[in-house]
Amino acid sequence: MTDDAAPSTRKIIHVDMDAFYASVEQRDNPELRGKPVAVGGSAARGVVAAASYEARAFGVRSALPSVTAKRRCPDLIFVPPRFDTYRAVSVQIREIYAEHTDLIEPLSLDEAYLDVTDNKQGIPVATEIATIIRARIKEVTGLNASAGISYCKFLAKMASDLNKPNGQAVISPKNGPGFVEALAVKKFHGVGPATAAKMERLGILTGADLRSKSLAWLQEYFGKSGAWYYNISRGIDNRAVQPDRPRKSVGAEDTFMVDIVDLDAARAEITPLAAKVWRHCEAKGLHGRTVTLKVKYADFQIITRSRTTSAPISWLDDLEAAAQSLLEPLFPAPKGIRLLGVTLSSFIDDEETTADQLELQI
């Protein structure tokens, strides 16, 4: 079932800290300011967890292998992550959000949705609230934040990218559908490279192209996601802002443009997936014991393999090694692999972990 109309009464803000981890490092170490900085490990198997804007100018980004990052930017400075510090700053930012609303949905340490429709300060204009929040974040933490304001989460998220860094933008109910129609589908939040490529093969390049398709057509080609694309192409997203809920698992997966047939290629794909899962778990202070590998073959058959450890996984290398050990017995592959996924679950409470388990080595 789809929605007939987008509610225009809600006021949603998406706040996104600018190059958060790297900016914290530049804030705390003046020698790093104005220089290309990558948070992560510089070792051969290291992965970039975050990059400063100076580094991004060279094509350095999160989840990029450190060797590749250094090749793109020879002057790149690697800094080991300090997740305890990032979490402490995130708490400060969350307290600023709470001055205005209790409807806070964190997506990670550095971004969150806020529903300020009925806010604590009684401020009727959401753009004013966003301006106040960004100024308070700068005052309290010394860091810059960008914000997007709209009537739904999807458009607030898209708006927060429009004037980065250190800016904000609004997409009104009047302009929402037109904004989506003009937007390239490959820029839609939630549409990955493989889905964008599929849409383009079907002649869907923009939101307007997507809107021209019927619900039945979209469901035929995109399954359960068809209804989502149908609504989003019309600027409709009625998802509520939901405060934090306990996570049962954290996973990452990737669909490949060309099916994978050999083990080395599959191993290379596991590395960034494990890094993405680890980065999110470290940011949330989650410590898990069960690693699950998901494999989707070219004929869409899906298999999973899991392994549970006696103690919580303490390092990124251990997570990746566990995933790789689950992968290797599947080769030689009986058919091409279309998708790989890595998930960490069986989380334990923070108080059960030791201090050294909060340190990340990449």
Where does each model-flagged region fall?
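Gly/Gly-Pro- and Ser/Thr-rich, intrinsically disordered tail segments characteristic of DNA damage-repair
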Residues: 1-221, 226-227, 344, 348-352, ...
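DNA-contacting surface of Y-family translesion DNA polymerases
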Residues: 5-7, 14, 187, 195-339, ...
